[in-house]
């Protein structure tokens, strides 16, 4: 009797998993559908470009320099680096490269804790229209902010950019990460976007408008996967995460 019950449970789980994979596969096919580009718009959006950084002295300046080379009016964006729990010269390197610094006041256990303070004390208090989030080891394409401006001006309140790899051939690990990024872009975010469904915020290179952040009561993630949690919060409040493949960042 026990073996029969276990067999039925395994069978049921296998059927459910198979149905999920069938659904995922059907949706993924739409990743090959040609999509219309977001209309180009004159620069209007004032961005806060935010990066939480812990012991990132070796790479943080590269991020800041790539942001300073944006094809976007410099008066319409600020670069804010929030060093936290550092034992190296991250703050000094970021400031020397041209970033503004924000020193978190509370106890920091995760990236979400940093974003909570930055959103409350900088993004919303500073009158920015939107926040772009980056990781300290990212490089940002020169047209990133211009293309995010297009998406925001088109009415999107949460936007995930195209997360690419800057070192796919360096090692087996970096190669696997690169394949993961490419598959996520093509078979998940691009496919779901083609169907009018919500994309997935994945780590960095994403934008959230100040209006959305106010509606959510600030940044309120509590898990270590703050990107997925934020995506869920958007879905629960009826907001779709858009995908903007023309806004490109390069991750390490």
Show which residues each predicted segment covers.
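Long helical/loop segments within the catalytic core of UDP-sugar-dependent glycosyltransferases
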Residues: 103, 110-114, 118-126, 142-223
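Catalytic donor-sugar/metal-binding loop of nucleotide-sugar-dependent glycosyltransferases
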Residues: 222, 231-249
